[in-house]
Regions:
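Cytosolic catalytic domains that perform sulfur/thiol-centered chemistry
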Residues: 1-398
């Protein structure tokens, strides 16, 4: 039988508080127009909606932040049915969570939230915006929804979010290194998609990487309000929202960008700029790659011959293979909470007070880490666009 307890009473003894709501509510999205925003200070997020998909490995990674045992006092808060589901699931792990925080949102304790929670939008918010309903954190002016992908136009035609445009990453990258195109070419691409600096752009993709890559490039260009659908296309489908088919509707081109381009050049580092960070104690070159890539066992790419790592780089984690970013994702493919990512990076002495340059092979995984850090409120961050691919071609870097 669940036992109600106030937050102050529960905290008189060491224990763990778990928020069983979805990550959007935990991060700070109100559950109603102008409603309460955030989560109990120090609470951990274990959403009931994850349980059917959460593997043992994912739970081990989740619990590594603060290991739990059969003796750990655990209290839950959220919807009653979610609390019951999480309690039953934890019981299978021989963990006991009989307490319920009765005053999670009515006590005097301040709530915490992700500083940039509005940058990661939930599917329900986007659906309401498209339907012209009132929403929290509404875009100030013109907004557009864009699906990002590489060679995915036919897939887009088969099904996409109603009203969405399609932007292929091939329009934004140039061979041979797949770095961002020159400023004038970038200006032309954005104009063709009707994007000005004051356009709110809401991005999604079939996997997390394409949306993150385009989001970073748009921010570098100077688009002021760039948001990403947290959980991507999968989140939209799982919510059962409408799906359109066919080509994107015609887009009215923008006459001008409305600002110098790039307006945020510091977000995209060149090879000399990346090299200059290596000898600075207040900076980190952060490799967002698999351990096999970071340790030099493989390059990760069939078109990159050299194996190894930038000397002095720190491992920012990634996942399995060149497209893997599991270390940053919840079981439902939403981004992990700030406490988890912060602890993951602190283990490699990667902290918010440093000048951070994320990189990977060619910029995609690094962009996801950038989007994550940006939402966490980290400010002195950028992406070394050339990554290991460019670095490995310059032997004098060694």
């Amino acid at each position: 039988m669940a036992q109600n307890i106030t937050l102050s009473q529960f905290r008189q003894n060491n224990g763990v508080v778990i928020d069983t709501r979805n990550s959007a509510l935990y991060n700070g999205w109100p559950d109603a127009l102008h409603g309460t925003s955030g989560h109990v200070s120090g609470a951990r997020n274990l959403a009931a909606s994850w349980l059917d998909e959460m593997t043992d490995a994912q739970f081990d990674a989740w619990s590594a932040l603060r290991p739990l045992s059969a003796e750990t006092r655990i209290a839950l808060y959220g919807e009653p049915e979610d609390n019951a589901a999480v309690e039953a699931w934890l019981r299978q792990k021989e963990l006991h969570a009989p307490w319920r925080i009765s005053d999670a949102f009515s006590c005097d304790c301040p709530l915490e939230r992700l500083p940039g929670f509005h940058q990661l939008v939930p599917a329900c918010w986007l659906n309401a915006l498209i339907a012209h309903r009132q929403v929290n954190e509404k875009p100030v002016g013109k907004w557009t929804v864009i699906e990002a992908g590489w060679g995915m136009r036919d897939t887009f035609r088969q099904g996409h979010i109603p009203g969405a445009d399609y932007l292929d990453t091939g329009e934004l990258e140039s061979e041979p290194l797949w770095n961002v195109v020159a400023p004038e070419a970038l200006r032309n691409v954005l104009a063709a998609h009707g994007i000005r600096c004051d356009t709110t752009v809401i991005l999604y993709s079939r996997t997390p990487l394409a949306a993150a890559r385009v989001a970073h490039i748009l921010l570098y260009a100077g688009v002021e309000d760039v948001r990403v659908l947290d959980g991507g296309w999968r989140a939209w489908l799982c919510a059962g929202f409408p799906v359109a088919s066919g080509d994107a509707l015609p887009i009215k081109s923008a006459c001008d960008f409305g600002a110098p381009l790039p307006a945020q050049p510091q977000l995209m580092l060149s090879l000399p700029q990346a090299r200059a960070l290596l000898n600075r104690k207040d900076a980190s070159m952060v490799s967002v790659r698999s351990w096999a890539e970071f340790s030099g066992a493989t390059s990760g790419y069939d078109y990159i011959d050299a194996c190894g790592e930038i000397p002095g780089a720190r491992w920012g984690r990634g996942g399995r293979g060149k497209d893997g970013v599991e270390d940053f994702l919840n079981p439902d493919a939403t981004l992990r909470c700030a406490d988890y990512v912060t602890a993951m990076w602190e283990a490699w002495n990667i902290t918010a007070d440093q000048h951070i340059a994320f990189y990977c092979g060619t910029g995609w995984r690094a962009s996801l880490a950038f989007i994550c850090a940006r939402a966490m409120g980290w400010t002195n961050i950028g992406v070394y666009d050339g990554g290991w691919y460019e670095w490995s071609l310059h032997h004098n870097n060694g």
